[in-house]
Amino acid sequence: MKILVQESLSAKQIEAAFRLWNNEYPEKLKFDKIEGFNDYLNNLDAKKHFLLIDAQDVIVGWSATFLRDNERWFAIILNSDVQGKSYGTSILNEIKKHENRLAGWAIDRDGVLRADGHMYKSPLQFYIKNGFNVQADNRIESERISAVKITWQLNAH
């Protein structure tokens, strides 16, 4: 596996990230059309993409960092076939080489359905294991998502 770091994505890479998003994230976060995903990407400020590529040159993971409300935020998605094999940690470690602080939303409850009918497993413990702090008093609650804010800071103890 290799990780590519890019400021923009090709049409093929956007399509792969779109498929990952719709296959792996909860169904309520699904984009109906690739144009909606493209709009999402185009509205991210100062973005950087991190692509996890397998031996057959298939994109099996995508992450992006971006500026929102004067903070560096991130999103990350791995194909479920490669989850639990340290590849998510590898991408986070690569991101941490480029950032001093990160913020994100983590769904902190199990029982949410993915589009394929399988359960979405909360990644919260994964983030805690990778040095993130849970901001329990900072939540997003909507019809589409229930999540807690997570943060990471270089050399935070």
What do these predicted ranges mean?
Residues 121-123, 139-147:
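Short glycine/proline-centered loop/turn elements that form peptide/ligand docking sites
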